[in-house]
Amino acid sequence: MPRAVSDELPVAAMVLDFGNVSTSVVSQYLILAYDDEYSINYFGQKLRPYWRRNGMQALDLLTAAVNDYANLQKQCEVFDQELIDDITKLGGEKYARVCALAYRQCLAGNKLAADANGQPMLFPKENSSNGCIATVDVIYPMEPFFLFLSPTLVKASLVPVLNYAASDRWKFPFAPHDLGCYPKATGQVYGGGEKTEDGQMPVEESGNMILLIAALAKIEGNAEFASLYWPQLTKWINYLEEKGFDPENQLCTDDFTGHLAHNANLSVKAILSLAAYGYLCEMRGDKINSAKYQKLAKEMAVKWASAADDGVHSRIAFDKPNTWSQKYNLVWDKILNLNVFDPKVTVQEIAYYKKVAIPLGLSYD
């Protein structure tokens, strides 16, 4: 009978005989696998797991893993060492350990499925909240991992959202928050869903999508992917141009804090999104709009520095003196080499963060 996983939780046990203890090395292994015939309900389409895209069955998967075990193990060891070495060179041993944990979380928190043509579609799941699938502000912090290791999977995570946003189902001028509740990607469930703007994240998600698509274009050296969805990007940038600098009483990815009007960090995201759109225009050969949006972003950045100023740091919101918050969205100014904000802004922010950080890290505000 169907039941919850936590109800009479099943336990599997295995006994391996390693023989008598001696100086000789003995090695054995177990294979754990999950045979999901279908992975995701994507708007009525039952998507197969990616490994099944060419007709492979569970027994085939296990057999292939056993037959190629030694080679796969070697590949994993080589990759692990190369990754850790690269990260250690960038930030040291402690930083490498944190990144190793982030690697596991980014990869394990996703389901890789195949569409009808066998193309990859990547669906993250919110594992510590309401189980939303393909949440844009979960994709956003996850994406640098895939930008670094697999731009193909960047596209695989963005395409489901972009296709939904381009459909008749999504009627708003801003980007959606999610596609449903895992494993059903059948329409947004967060906030007002598809019905109202209540509880949405308009500036947050619109900015996220534009910044990520610009980052992908930078990695690939062209804006071909962006061009496939240009009407959606243009719609979102029009919204950000009107609403982004001084956000209304909206939620952002830090929704545990509740609604916050005049959110300074959210404003940073909108400003850099305008510049990122200008960057995409430049790659598409549209010099007029490229100049327009990059100029607009730089003008807003100057206004932002004044509106958010609180002495030796910036405010959490334009109307809240004697406050502060992390301005992590500033990172895209550096990643995309947009040069929108005065470098003094970042220098000042980081200097203050170092003062208020505790051994366990830096709080949000």
Task: Give the residues covered by each predicted segment.
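Structural helix-adjacent loops and short alpha-helical linkers that scaffold large soluble proteins
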Residues: 88-97, 147-158, 217-234, 278-298, ...
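Residues that flank catalytic or metal-binding motifs in active/ligand-binding sites
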Residues: 10-12, 26, 205, 266, ...
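Extended ligand-binding clefts on enzyme/binding-domain cores
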Residues: 126-138, 144-151, 162-165, 170, ...
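Aromatic-rich carbohydrate-recognition surfaces in CAZymes
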Residues: 22, 46-73, 131-246, 263-281
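Acidic/His metal-coordination segments adjacent to aromatic residues that form catalytic metal sites
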Residues: 116-124, 182-201, 245-264, 308-315
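A compositional/structural signature marking long, glycine- and acidic/polar-rich segments
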Residues: 234-325
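Acidic/polar, glycine-enriched structural segments that form the non-catalytic walls/loops
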Residues: 1-134, 155, 162-167
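Extended, well-ordered alpha-helical segments in internal regulatory regions
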Residues: 32, 40, 271-282, 330-341
